[in-house]
C-alpha cells in the first residue's frame, strides 16, 4: 500500500496524463468519430475499475481528513455500537457490511457506490459515448475531495445523478432518489429542485433567479444563511447550523466561485446549439432546395393530370387553375390559390417564394437556447443546476459554504459536456470540443489542487 501522502499527487498527475491522452485521441479522430466507440466502451470499464481500486484501498490516514472518523465509526458499529450518522441507508449499509467486511473492504464498497453510478448514469443517456461524460465527472474540481473526505455526500450525489438519468422511468427514479436521501439528507435540495423544474421549464426564469440571488447575497450579506439556519428542515440534525456558523474554513463572498459556477450555463448558451444547428441548416438546404420543390410540383401536376381529373382540369388546351387548386385542397379559384400560388410565386416555375423570417428575441439569438428547447432532459438538468446553485449563493458567506456548493457542483461536468456528446437529440459527437472541454475543466482542477491549495498551506 502506498504512503497516504502520495495519493492526492498521484490522482492529479495520473488524471492529467489520462485527460491529455484522451483529448489528443478525440482531437485526432474528429472525422472518424465512429472508430472511437470501441475505445469508449473499454476505457469506461478500465478507468472506472481503476478509480474504485485506487480510492477504495487507500490507507486510513489523517491526510484524508474525515476518513479517520468514518473508520472509527465503522469499527464501533462492528462491535455493536451505534452510528453517529442520521442517514438511515448509510447506517444500514454500515451494519450490513460490518458483519463480514474489514475497514478497507468497507471503503471499497463506498468507492464503488461513489464511482459506479456515474458510469451507469452516463451510459443510460449517452450509450457508447458515455466515457467522455464519465471522465469529466472523475476530473471535476470536487470529485477527489468527496471521494476521500466527504464520503457520504459523494455517494449520495452519485446515486442522485443515476436517478436523474432515469427521469423517464419514475418507477426507477423515485427509489433511487430515496436511496440518495438515505445516504445523505442534503440531497433533498437537488431532488426537490429536479422535481420542481419539471413544471417550471423556462431556463430564462431560473437564470434570472440565479442572478437575483447573486445580487441579494452581495448586497444583503449573511441574511441568506441566517434564513436557512432558521428554517432548517432537519431540526434534529445540527449539521446545517454547523456548516453555516462554524469556523473551520474561511468564509466571505467568493466572486471566483461565483464565476466558476456560471461557466457551464454560459458555455451552453454560447456553444451548445452549434451542434444541432449545423444539422438543421443542412436539412433545410436539402429539404427546401429548388430541385426538390420543382420535383414536388411535377408530381402534383402529374397526379392531377391522371385519370378523370385530366379532362376536368384541362379545357381546350388551357389549364384551369381553379380545378387544379381544388384538387390540391385549395379553397378558392384562380391563380392565387393552391398550386397556382406556388406556380406564380416570385420564385416562378414551382419554386416556393421566400418567406419572411420572424425576428428572434434576444435570447433566441443564443445558439444554446435551441438545444434547451429541443432536449427536455438537458433543459431540466440545466434548470436544476441553476436552482440548486442559486440557493448555495444565498449562503455563500458561510464558513463552510462549499458543503452547499457541492449540491450543485456535482452536476457541473454533465451540464458542461452534455451538448457535445451523442444523446437523444445530438447524434454526432463534436470530438474537438469534447477534447477542449475535458482539458479546460481539468486544467482548473489541476491548478487548484497542485498549485493554489499547496500555496495556501505555505502562506
Task: Please place each PLM-identified region on the residue numbering.
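Alpha-helical transmembrane segments and terminal signal-anchor/GPI-anchor hydrophobic tails
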Residues: 63, 67-72, 87, 194-305, ...
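Membrane-interface alpha helices of multi-pass inner-membrane proteins
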Residues: 172-196, 392-393
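Signature aromatic-anchored transmembrane alpha helix within multi-pass, membrane-resident enzymes
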Residues: 208-212, 426-445
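Transmembrane-helix signature of polytopic, membrane-embedded enzymes
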Residues: 38, 122-140
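Transmembrane-helix motifs of polytopic, lipid-linked glycan transferases
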Residues: 109-126
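Short acidic/glycine- and proline-prone juxtamembrane loop motifs at membrane-interface regions
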Residues: 147-154
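Membrane-interface transmembrane helices that cradle and orient dolichyl/undecaprenyl
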Residues: 154, 160-172
Amino acid at each position: 500500500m502506498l504512503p497516504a501522502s502520495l495519493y492526492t499527487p498521484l490522482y492529479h498527475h495520473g488524471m492529467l496524463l489520462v485527460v491529455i491522452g484522451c483529448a489528443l485521441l478525440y482531437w485526432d479522430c474528429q472525422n472518424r468519430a465512429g472508430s472511437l466507440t470501441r475505445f469508449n466502451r473499454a476505457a469506461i470499464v478500465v478507468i472506472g475499475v481503476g478509480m474504485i481500486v485506487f480510492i477504495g484501498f487507500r490507507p486510513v490516514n489523517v491526510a484524508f481528513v474525515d476518513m479517520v472518523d468514518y473508520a472509527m465509526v465503522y469499527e464501533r458499529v462492528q462491535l455493536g455500537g451505534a452510528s453517529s450518522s442520521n442517514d438511515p441507508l448509510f447506517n444500514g449499509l454500515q451494519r450490513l457490511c460490518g458483519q463480514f467486511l474489514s475497514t478497507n473492504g468497507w471503503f471499497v464498497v463506498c468507492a464503488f457506490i461513489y464511482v459506479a453510478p456515474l458510469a451507469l448514469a452516463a451510459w443510460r443517456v449517452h450509450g457508447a459515448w458515455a466515457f467522455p461524460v464519465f471522465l469529466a465527472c472523475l476530473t471535476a474540481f470536487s470529485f477527489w475531495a468527496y471521494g476521500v473526505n466527504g464520503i457520504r455526500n459523494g455517494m449520495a450525489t452519485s446515486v442522485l445523478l443515476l436517478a436523474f438519468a432515469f427521469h423517464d422511468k419514475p418507477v426507477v427514479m423515485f427509489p433511487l432518489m430515496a436511496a440518495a436521501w438515505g445516504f445523505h439528507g442534503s440531497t433533498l435540495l437537488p431532488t426537490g429542485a429536479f422535481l420542481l423544474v419539471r413544471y417550471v421549464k423556462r431556463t430564462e426564469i431560473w437564470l434570472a433567479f440565479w442572478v437575483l440571488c447573486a445580487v441579494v447575497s452581495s448586497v444583503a450579506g449573511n441574511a441568506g444563511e441566517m434564513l436557512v439556519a432558521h428554517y432548517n428542515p432537519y431540526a434534529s440534525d445540527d449539521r446545517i447550523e454547523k456548516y453555516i456558523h462554524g469556523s473551520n474554513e474561511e468564509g466571505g463572498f467568493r466572486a471566483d466561485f461565483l464565476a466558476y459556477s456560471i461557466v457551464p450555463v454560459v458555455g451552453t448558451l454560447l456553444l451548445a446549439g452549434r451542434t444541432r444547428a449545423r444539422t438543421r441548416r443542412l436539412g433545410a438546404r436539402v429539404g427546401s432546395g429548388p430541385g426538390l420543390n420543382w420535383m414536388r410540383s411535377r408530381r402534383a401536376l402529374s397526379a392531377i393530370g391522371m385519370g378523370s381529373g385530366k379532362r376536368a382540369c384541362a379545357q381546350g388546351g388551357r389549364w384551369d387553375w381553379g380545378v387544379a387548386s381544388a384538387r390540391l385542397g385549395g379553397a378558392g379559384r384562380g391563380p392565387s390559390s393552391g398550386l397556382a400560388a406556388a406556380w406564380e410565386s416570385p420564385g416562378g416555375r414551382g419554386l416556393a417564394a421566400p418567406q419572411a423570417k420572424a425576428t428572434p428575441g434576444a435570447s433566441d439569438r443564443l445558439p444554446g437556447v435551441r438545444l434547451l428547447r429541443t432536449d427536455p432532459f438537458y433543459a431540466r438538468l440545466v434548470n436544476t443546476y441553476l436552482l440548486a446553485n442559486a440557493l448555495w449563493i444565498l449562503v455563500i458567506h458561510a464558513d463552510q459554504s462549499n458543503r452547499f456548493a457541492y449540491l450543485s457542483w456535482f452536476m457541473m461536468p454533465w451540464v458542461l459536456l452534455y451538448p457535445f456528446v451523442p444523446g437523444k437529440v445530438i447524434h454526432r459527437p463534436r470530438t474537438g470540443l469534447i477534447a477542449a472541454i475535458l482539458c479546460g475543466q481539468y486544467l482548473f482542477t489541476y491548478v487548484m489542487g497542485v498549485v493554489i491549495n499547496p500555496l495556501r498551506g505555505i502562506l
